[in-house]
Amino acid sequence: MPKVALIETKPSKTNFRQEFDGAFEFDQFQLCSNPTIKKVLKKDCDIEIDSSLYDWIILVGSDALKFFTKINSVTEYSGKVVEQKFLPVINPAMLAFKPEARKTWEDSKDSIIGFISGTKQETFVDESIAFGIQDTATANAFIQDAIDYDYTHVALDSETTGLYPRDGHMLGLSLSYDGEKGAYIDTECFDETTEALLQELFDKKTVIFHNAKFDLAFFQYHFNFNFPQIEDTMLLHYLIDENPGTHGLKQLAMKYTPYGDYEQPMYEWIGEYRKSHGILKEQFSWDLIPFHTMKVYAAMDSLVTFLVYEKFKKIKQNAKLLWVYDNILIPGTRFLLNVQDNGV
């Protein structure tokens, strides 16, 4: 059995062995040994632990997570693997005053037990499932494969140099047509055949976006593509969860796919690049990222969009939600595109 440590903020009455159903043994630690301190600061932490002795380290709550990693949101990462050995989890004590978090706790508990027991494996992202294309012939062949594939839909995403098509251009597009792989295609390799094949694809298939209003603006403005049938996973999520800050592709990918925070290495690269070049956050643009650095993570965007849609399409089985989606949200997206482009 793997060697496991559990770290909470300070001594508490929570019976973690019971909370985890006695599924595994662990050594228990606290960041701060003084239970009387209300808000534990870094200066209060007196924990002594050799993390190299443990295969898994469960981090209970945001304080422990922030102490050992660069991540702040324990709710977002609860039950996920961070940096290969850390397992963040919300504090089950919070359920007494926040019972709506019960499902998050139960799902996280099952996930952690699975990782520790070996019945659940971390899913790694590499070029076997997410890859880049900079060759015209290879790009055209991939798009033709998407056209010929027997699924009725494809997922599409774009990487751009700006927020608005008049201020920037498209660096590349990400395409997944089978839910098993995604490709990031450099727009520099497009020729007339590429554009014709893409339009044929968009005419034949339903195209799934995440935040379609953003991507459609660039595809229509720079390439004059038409999209007769679209879906939007962000809008589908709005139908079941109206809370702000919960609709990002990363959050949904972490919750509904096995791929977790697949973009984290790229954002670490961005942080190092900004630091070494003295660039402020607002001065950074995506064209500063080399293709070979971006390709895997950009390709993953369309793959996880495809997988999230597979989870969300059953939402449309609810007739009332379907009416809102088909008659308000999707038409509203197209209307806002016209307003953005032409004004009111």
Describe these PLM feature segments:
Residues 1-122:
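A polyanion-binding, active-site-adjacent surface
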Residues 6-7, 89, 154-157, 230-231:
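Short hydrophobic beta-strand that contains or immediately precedes a catalytic carboxylate
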Residues 11, 20-24, 170-172, 339-344:
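Short, intrinsically disordered, charge-balanced linker/junction segments flanking boundaries
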Residues 55-62, 155, 205-212:
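Acidic beta-strand-to-loop metal/phosphate-binding motif
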Residues 93-95, 103-106, 110, 116-134, ...:
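Active-site-proximal helix-loop-helix substrate-binding element of RNase H-like nuclease domains
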Residues 134-152, 197-201:
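A short acidic-Thr-Gly-centered motif at the start of a beta-strand
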Residues 323-344:
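Extended, well-ordered alpha-helical scaffold/bundle regions in very large, multi-domain proteins
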